[in-house]
Swiss-Prot record:
It catalyses: a ubiquinone + NADH + 5 H(+)(in) = a ubiquinol + NAD(+) + 4 H(+)(out). It comes from the Eukaryota. GO terms for molecular function: NADH dehydrogenase (ubiquinone) activity. This is NADH-ubiquinone oxidoreductase chain 2. The lineage of its organism: Eukaryota, Metazoa, Chordata, Craniata, Vertebrata. The gene is MT-ND2.
Amino acid sequence: MNPYRRATLLCSVGLGTTLTFASSHWLLAWMGLEINTLAITPLMAQHHHPRAVEATTKYFLTQATAAAMILFASTTNAWMTGEWSINDLSNPIASTMFMAALALKIGLAPMHFWMPEVLQGLDLLTGLILSTWQKLAPLALIIQTAQTIDPLLLTLLGISSTLVGGWGGLNQTQLRKILAYSSIAHMGWMIIVIQYAPQLTLIALGTYIIMTSAAFLTLKMSLTTKISTLATTWSKSPILTSTTALVLLSLGGLPPLTGFMPKWLILQELTKQDLPIIATAMALTALISLYFYLRLLYAMTLTISPNMINSTTPWRTQTTQTSLPLALFTTAALGLLPMAPAILMLTT
C-alpha cells in the first residue's frame, strides 16, 4: 500500500477513536465508531489475499450490524426520554440493546464468533491494531454508560467471555486464533468489574494492551503463526524465544509477571463487593486460559520439531533485528507487578 494512503488511514482510525472519546452526543459517538470501522477496513484487505478479503468482509458485516443496533438504541432512547446525551441512557430496552451492540463490537461472548476467524485472516501488525486500538472506543462508551446497564447482564457477559476465551483456545493450533480467544477472555475480566471499579477496568485494559503488543511483536519478529513452528524458534533465536515464553505466561496471568496484577486486583474488588461466588468462577476460568498458555510454553521449550536438522543451538546465532517498541512492551509486560500499589494509587 502507498505510504501516504496508509498514513491517511491510520490518522482516520485515530480520528474516529478520538471523536468517540470526546463526544457526549449519541450521533457523534456513532460517527466516530463508523469512521474507525471504515478506516481500518482497507488496512485489513491491503494484501489482497483471499483470507484477508474474507476476514475484512466478516469484520465489516459484524461492525455494520453493531453500528445499526447502536443507532437504533440511541433513537429508541431519544424517543422514549427525549435525551440524546450518552449519560442519560435511562430506557432499559435501549440500554440492553446498546450493551449487546458494544459487546458485538469488542467481541464479548456470546457475540464473539467473528473475532477468531477475522484475526486468523490478518497479518500480525493489523491483528495487533484490531486487538488493541479498536477496543478503545467501544470500551469508553461502556464505561460511560455502565451505571445504567443491568448488573446481571454485565456479570453474564463477563463470566461467559472468560469461560469461552479459555475453552475456545484449548483446541487451537493457530497462534492468532489463540490470541483472539485470549482477547475475549481479557475483555470478560474488564467487563465483570466495570460497574464497581472503573479504574480497575482501565488498569486491566492498559496491561492487556502492553502484553498483547509484546506478544504480537515477538511473534512477528520470529515469523511464527502456528504452534508447530514454535519448536523451531529456539535454535534460531534463543533469547527471543525465552522472551516470547515469558510474555505468553504474563498473558496467562502467572505471578510474578505483569498479567497477574489486574486479575489479582479484580478478584480483590469482587470479594470486597460480597461477590465471592463470581470471584471464584473468574479464578477457575483463568486456570483454563493458563492451561493453553502452558501448552504453548511446552511446545516452545520442551519439544523438537521432526524437521529439525540440527538439534543443538549453534554457538553463534544470528543477530536479531532490534526493535525499541518490542523492548519497551516486553519490559512492561514482565515487570510491572511490583508497581501495582503505585499504579492503583494513580488511578484512584
